[in-house]
C-alpha cells in the first residue's frame, strides 16, 4: 500500500482492507474525502477511520 488518491468505491475497499473486522466509521463530514480523494492519504491516516 502506497500513499495514493482514493475516491468512491476505491476508498471504501481500502477501508475494508485496513480496518477488517473492526469495521469503520464513514461519513463525509469526517474529512476523509478531502484527506484521501482530493489529497493523498496513507495507510496510517486510513486507520484513523476504523472503529
Curated annotation (Swiss-Prot):
Subcellular location: Secreted
Entry's Gene Ontology molecular function annotations: hormone activity
Intrachain disulfide bonds: 7-37, 19-50, 36-41
GO BP term, pick one: cellular response to oxygen-containing compound
Keywords tagged on the record: Carbohydrate metabolism, Disulfide bond, Glucose metabolism, Hormone, Secreted
Pfam families per record: Insulin (PF00049)
Transmembrane annotation, as ranges: none
Main location: secreted
Recorded superkingdom: Eukaryota
InterPro entries cross-referenced by the UniProt entry: Insulin, Insulin-like, Insulin-like_sf, Insulin_CS, Insulin_family
Subunit-level organization: Heterodimer of a B chain and an A chain linked by two disulfide bonds.
Known function: Insulin decreases blood glucose concentration. It increases cell permeability to monosaccharides, amino acids and fatty acids. It accelerates glycolysis, the pentose phosphate cycle, and glycogen synthesis in liver.
Protein family membership: Belongs to the insulin family.
Protein name: Insulin
Phylogenetic classification of the source organism: Eukaryota, Metazoa, Chordata, Craniata, Vertebrata
Gene from which the chain derives: INS
Amino acid at each position: 500500500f502506497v500513499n495514493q488518491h482514493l475516491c468512491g468505491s476505491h476508498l471504501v475497499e481500502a477501508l475494508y482492507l485496513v480496518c477488517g473486522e473492526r469495521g469503520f466509521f464513514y461519513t463525509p463530514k469526517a474529512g476523509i474525502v478531502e484527506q484521501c480523494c482530493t489529497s493523498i492519504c496513507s495507510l496510517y491516516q486510513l486507520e484513523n477511520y476504523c472503529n
